[in-house]
């Protein structure tokens, strides 16, 4: 995924498209993640997505659902933004 991407559009299971603002991209333990928030909605929480490759080699974004992995991403995110 390009580091200069500011917004992405994701499609949910029902085909509804939502535009998200990319807050940051993180490289953790040989995996890439993006932290996003819905662009036109007020929310208190960001969403962590892992960048994987599908069977065709295309990049896909997968929600981080395992607690251990989510905590690792959240910790890296907090560390990054506590330094600013």
Curated annotation (Swiss-Prot):
InterPro entries xrefs: UPF0473
Family: Belongs to the UPF0473 family.
Domain of life of the source: Bacteria
Protein name as catalogued: UPF0473 protein CLD_2004
Species whose genome carries this gene: Clostridium botulinum (strain Okra / Type B1)
Entries under HAMAP family matching the protein: UPF0473
